[in-house]
Amino acid sequence: MELKFLGEPCLTTVSEPVSEVDEQLRAFISGMFRVMRGAGGVGLAAPQVGRTVRVFVVDVEHHVRAFINPQITAASEEQSSYEEGCLSIPHIYERVLRPRRVSVQYLDENGKRCAVDADGILARVIQHEYDHLDGILFLDRIDEKRRDDALRRYAALRGTIR
């Protein structure tokens, strides 16, 4: 299992719902946690390792969990701006405006229906990873000028021409 980077089609593809929570999925989720922690991340979505299924994992502020088929059911009108990065776009950071709080329903690794009301950094990580499931990158959430600048910086870091 390897990280996928900006330019890979899986990062801009809408993910499919998980049909069954089984041992194979649990093993995949364990691998996701290993990749995320190995890269020093706090969240990782399945498309970032090449599988376009609706799963992400988080490890932030003592909240360590997998979200299977998550649905954001509510988001606060109050927003906050915070610098975000992404394991799939290394060394690029930009401020992103997002709702401060979200409510999420999801299945856990045992297929149990769960819900969480998140705020602060946990809410931000959930929203960032949830976006991946819809083929949205954090750079899609910023203005065009900043996005173009970030893409130029990324291309220079990757040694490519865009």
UniProtKB/Swiss-Prot annotation:
Enzyme class: hydrolase
UniProt-annotated catalytic positions: 129
GO term, biological process aspect, one: translation
Record's catalysed reaction(s): N-terminal N-formyl-L-methionyl-[peptide] + H2O = N-terminal L-methionyl-[peptide] + formate
EC annotation from Swiss-Prot or TrEMBL: 3.5.1.88
Annotated Pfam families: Pep_deformylase
Note describing how the cofactor binds: Binds 1 Fe(2+) ion.
Entry GO MF terms: metal ion binding; peptide deformylase activity
InterPro entries with a match to the protein in the record: Peptide_deformylase (IPR023635), Peptide_deformylase_sf (IPR036821)
Chain coiled-coil ranges: none
Membrane-spanning intervals of the chain: none
Annotated residues for binding of Fe cation: 86, 128, 132
Keywords tagged on the record: Hydrolase, Iron, Metal-binding, Protein biosynthesis
Cofactors, names only: Fe(2+)
Biological role: Removes the formyl group from the N-terminal Met of newly synthesized proteins. Requires at least a dipeptide for an efficient rate of reaction. N-terminal L-methionine is a prerequisite for activity but the enzyme has broad specificity at other positions.
Family named by the database record: Belongs to the polypeptide deformylase family.
UniProt protein name: Peptide deformylase
Native organism: Treponema pallidum (strain Nichols)
